C-alpha cells in the first residue's frame, strides 16, 4: 500500500493539520516509510510466541479490585469550558 499526494492532503484535513504544498512530498515519503515498516511487521512469524507485557520479565503488581466513583467528578470537570452531566463537551472533529 502506498500513499499519494491526494491521500496526504485528505489525512491532513481530517487531522486538522496544515501541510503546505511544498511539504506534501516529504510527508508522503514519511507515511510510505511507516507503512512499509508496518508491512515488515506483518511478515514476522509469531506463531508460538507467548504474549508479553514487557521485554524484561517483571512481576505484575495487583491491587484490590474495588469499584468506587472516585468522588472527584466535580473537580475533574471544574476547569472545562463546557460540560454536561460530568462529561466533557467537545466540538465535532470528524465529518
Swiss-Prot record:
Key word Protein biosynthesis present: yes
Pfam assignment, any one: GatC
Transmembrane segments: none
Signal peptide location: none
Keyword Nucleus: no
EC number annotated for this UniProt entry: 6.3.5.-
Annotated coiled-coil segments of the chain: none
GO biological-process terms attached to the record: glutaminyl-tRNAGln biosynthesis via transamidation; regulation of translational fidelity; translation
Recorded superkingdom: Bacteria
Protein keywords: ATP-binding, Ligase, Nucleotide-binding, Protein biosynthesis
SUPFAM superfamilies: Glu-tRNAGln amidotransferase C subunit (SSF141000)
Reactions that this protein is recorded to catalyse: L-glutamyl-tRNA(Gln) + L-glutamine + ATP + H2O = L-glutaminyl-tRNA(Gln) + L-glutamate + ADP + phosphate + H(+); L-aspartyl-tRNA(Asn) + L-glutamine + ATP + H2O = L-asparaginyl-tRNA(Asn) + L-glutamate + ADP + phosphate + 2 H(+)
Enzyme class, broadest EC rank: ligase
Function of the protein: Allows the formation of correctly charged Asn-tRNA(Asn) or Gln-tRNA(Gln) through the transamidation of misacylated Asp-tRNA(Asn) or Glu-tRNA(Gln) in organisms which lack either or both of asparaginyl-tRNA or glutaminyl-tRNA synthetases. The reaction takes place in the presence of glutamine and ATP through an activated phospho-Asp-tRNA(Asn) or phospho-Glu-tRNA(Gln).
Assigned protein family: Belongs to the GatC family.
NCBIfam families, alphabetized: gatC (TIGR00135)
Protein name: Aspartyl/glutamyl-tRNA(Asn/Gln) amidotransferase subunit C
Native organism: Beijerinckia indica subsp. indica (strain ATCC 9039 / DSM 1715 / NCIMB 8712)
